[in-house]
Swiss-Prot record:
Job description of the protein: Transports acetate.
Places the protein is found: Cell inner membrane
Superkingdom of source: Bacteria
Residue intervals passing through the bilayer: 5-25, 34-54, 77-97, 104-124, 150-170, 184-204, 207-227, 263-283, 304-324, 356-376, 406-426, 430-450, 469-489, 498-518
This protein's name: Cation/acetate symporter ActP
GO biological process: plasma membrane acetate transport; sodium ion transport
Membrane-related topology note: Multi-pass membrane protein
Organism: Yersinia pseudotuberculosis serotype O:1b (strain IP 31758)
PANTHER family: CATION_ACETATE SYMPORTER ACTP, SODIUM/PROLINE SYMPORTER-RELATED
Amino acid sequence: MKIRHWSALSLFVLPALAQAEALTGEVHRQPLNIQAIVMFLLFVGGTLYITYWASKRTRSRQDYYTAGGRITGFQNGLAIAGDYMSAASFLGISALVYASGYDGLIYSIGFLIGWPIILFLIAERLRNLGRYTFADVASYRLQQRPIRTLSACGSLVVVALYLIAQMVGAGKLIQLLFGLNYHVAVVLVGILMVLYVLFGGMLATTWVQIIKAVMLLSGATFMAIMVMKSVNFNFNTLFSEAVKVHPKGLSIMSPGGLVSDPISALSLGLALMFGTAGLPHILMRFFTVSDAKEARKSVFYATGFIGYFYILTFIIGFGAILLVGPNQTFKDAAGALLGGNNMAAVHLANAVGGSFFLGFISAVAFATILAVVAGLTLAGASAVSHDLYASVIKKGKANERDELRVSKITVIILGIVAIGLGILFEKQNIAFMVGLAFSIAASCNFPIIIISMYWDKLTTRGAMIGGWLGLSTAVILMILGPTIWVTILGHEKPIYPYEYPALFSMIAAFIGTWFFSITDNSETGKQERLLFKSQFVRSQTGLGASKGGAH
């Protein structure tokens, strides 16, 4: 039960994990798919042209980090959806529905929970208070150097874990769909990722994400329509026929089959819910619009697109039960699905649209990874150049040219590191990194952002101790947990018995921040509390906020 639970969770906790087997089992390499290769090359050619176009319009620091603030709310909503909707969601959740039925819907809802928090509590204030990174907001009335250092470290740890998982996921996915060598796939993704961000900055990254979102939504919509057409657009027929052909029968319509440990499930739920609001590459997108109103519209549109997409994956999963499961064309000699369960959506694409549509869906799956790694790389580069170099090392006195140069050097270094780690971790089960990334975002980044915006008694001392406490607790508990302590290090029993640390590390972060703030009687602390009123006025009105260019 534990193994089943873990392999299920590894499918969809992050956009990086585009496949179950890539992380938890054998990868079945597919024959070279020429149509998929052609469509992928068309996508790459188009996005490289966009990068060239964007490079001509990226002249300043604001252009590079935020596309000059000229992205509309609708465009940014699509881009956020493109950054968030993943190959993991498309292949992973549909695979879970194919294998276990109703439980897949529960996990897809888990991804949506965090967006109302961003919509109602974070988006507008973040846009009014910040400029390029969420550290601008966290350090608004606190001491710049320690807070920016903490925020940058939290961002870089999340980005690094995300990138490792993305690169391993990319290599395995391309091996599955295209038949290419794993190392070739990882190097290819790394090179494209660097090109997009190095030359096109946020403008190129945004349009890559928009194109990917449109392709993914279009492809998934077509698949869902074809599935519903096969049952005369009757959901009762879809579910009743699926129950008849599925080996588990009626149990696929019941929830709870994948939950073996309530504490781990609760901890994962907290990480997903609050970690989303602490992901640096998602938060960075709110600075690409002109004002708080457009930021709010961005989240509204993004939530709509993402919610619609997860409904589609549920239909696609049941469609695979109905149209792929009984079809021996998609099975091997042992009766198992070719390529593993996570190929269910890809086989369904073949079943409803033939080889041409199969090629399109394969290319879309690869495009999802390119869109996400581009956003991650830019978030990591901005944390180094804007937060660490310009604000900490140069104490806010760096010139724009030097800051951009540092950012671009960081992009190249991140690309090389991502390729190296992707190759290094090829044989590893890296699912634990996914849980750790969300847990760190929820335990370090989220508490700092939310408390700094809403609590007038916060001081630098409280934020520093609470933030580092959350970050270190998440890492230590993950190391002492069953995945690393037992599976990787080979000990008999874990010291920390649960899969995810967020339940405890978040509590540590919030309590630490609260306690060390209220006990801070220093003059600096008193001054920081007095500055809350001016921060509150700006966060509500936008007076003095950085403005984007004209749309």
